[in-house]
Structure formats: C-alpha cells, structure tokens
Amino acid sequence: MKSQASKVNRGFAIATGTAIALCALAVSPGAEEQASLQLAAAVQTECDRLAGSPYDQQRNSEFAPVGIDDIDDSAVNACQMAYDATGNPRFAYQLGRALNKIQQPDHAMSAYNAAVQAGYPAAKVNFGMLMGRLGDEQAEFQLYQEAALSGNVLGAYNLGVAYRDGLGTKPDVSKALQWFEKAAAEGDDTAAFNIGTIYDEGQLVPQDDQMAIAWYDLAAQRGNTDAMVNLGLMYETGEGIAADAKKAAEMYRQAGENGDLFGAYKFLQMQELGIVPAPSDPSMPEGVNSLVLKPGDVETPTTVGKEI
C-alpha cells in the first residue's frame, strides 16, 4: 500500500518586472491623491489575482485561487506595494507565497510573520512549516493549532500530521484522526487518504479494512490518485472486499489518467494479463507503456502534501 502522506510543505527580492503598468499612471497636476488611490487599488487587485491561495478562506473570492507553483513572479511587486499601501495581512501572506515561489524563504518568513502578528490563519500554517524546517517543532505545532482552531483547513490537516507523527507534541492518534476528519469534512482529499492508511496499516489503531476502504473511496472520489491505487490493490487482492480484477483495473486506469505512474503501470499489467482490452490508452502519461516499464521500475510514491 502507499504510505501515509506527510505534512504540508509550504520567498524576498523585489522583482524588477511586473505584469501591470504600476508606474505608468498619468498624474495631472492636483490629481496626485486620486492617482495614488488608483495605484493602490490596482496593486491590490493584482496581488489577489496572482497570489490568492486555495487554502485561504479569507482570500478574495472574485479571483480563482492560484497554486504556489503557478504564482507569477510579478506578484512580488504587486503584493509588496499592496501591503505597503494598506497594511492588510492578506497581502503580507500573499507576498510570502510569492517570495516562497521565487525561493526567498528568509524574506518569505518576514512577510508571513507580519501576517501572523495580525492573526492571519493561513499565514500561521506557512510560517509554522518554515519554523519546523528551522528545527522548532514546538512553534510549528503551536502555529498549526492556532490556524486549525481558527477554522483553516490546512491548519487542521497539518495538526493531524503533528499529532500522528509527534511533531512538537506527544503522538496521539485519536487527536490525529479528529483533525484529519475535520479537514476531510471540508473537502481535503489527502486528509481522507491519511485516515484510510491509518486503518489500512493497523499500526496506530486496530486494522480495519472496511474503514480503510470507506476513506480511500472518499479520497478517490475527490481525485486522490494514491487512494485510487490503494483501492485497486485491495480489489486485486481481495483485501477486505470481494476480489474484482476489473474494478481493480478501473481504479488503476483512473490513477494513471491522472498522472500516477504506478497506477499506469498496474493498468498496463492488467492489459497484458488480458483482464482489460490491450490497446494502449492515449490518455496515459507520455512514455508509459509495457515496453519500458517493468516490475520494480516504478517505486510506489508517497504523497508529500500541498503547498498553500
């Protein structure tokens, strides 16, 4: 089975270029104040558009959330100017995300800390992660706990990981499950997958295949490829459920179509065994075929969590 997911991994040089003409606003005599207000509004809009997090319940919902890997470098300028103009902790947090993206963790910490001092929950999650990287697990735990108690989904997820793994606190599987369940109730697929692995592996609680299947199924429905693979393995071996090779193949197919190489390999293996039709699936990841993938070539991956 795929192993349990780890905690969430969550930067300061001002970029010289920007996607908006921040300095191109024409200012007529006597209109400096109006121009300043226009500029402030423009940079706030750009910061929200370029760097709003999918895990921040306080983000500007007028714009689609942006994953940390997709943040444009110009967000650094926009968010710095937006924060300087308003002092709004949301812009400090989004500045931290933009700085994280360009690999400036020290300056990202300064931006996150400004938001943390203002009580911004999402910033506490990212600042906690960075404190953990510096070796201060107690501060990491405290920040996750504060974020979780404020209702932040990723804070709840990371707090579950902390209780499961004993990060900054004593391991407590009951509390780990409690916080994973809170995150899962808000739609977090990795939290649901983690609950499934806890019951599947039976190391922290009595092993329970039915509970594992139920939580894997929920995670798979939400698009978690690790859960798809684990369900496929359970169907293939008849672990806790009637063996069904075709259902196993279907779970592997779905995982492969969503980019999971192990799932793709298992589906191709099923094709070679004649369990499903042999023609190659054009939706499989590029380069994945039975001629290049052999048993042992693909290591079962571990979900590493999400950037916010």
Where is each model-derived feature located?
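Hydrophobic face of amphipathic alpha-helices that form TPR/SEL1-like repeat modules
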Residues: Q94-K101, K124-L134, A156-D165, A192-E201, ...
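Bacterial N-terminal signal peptides
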Residues: A15-A24
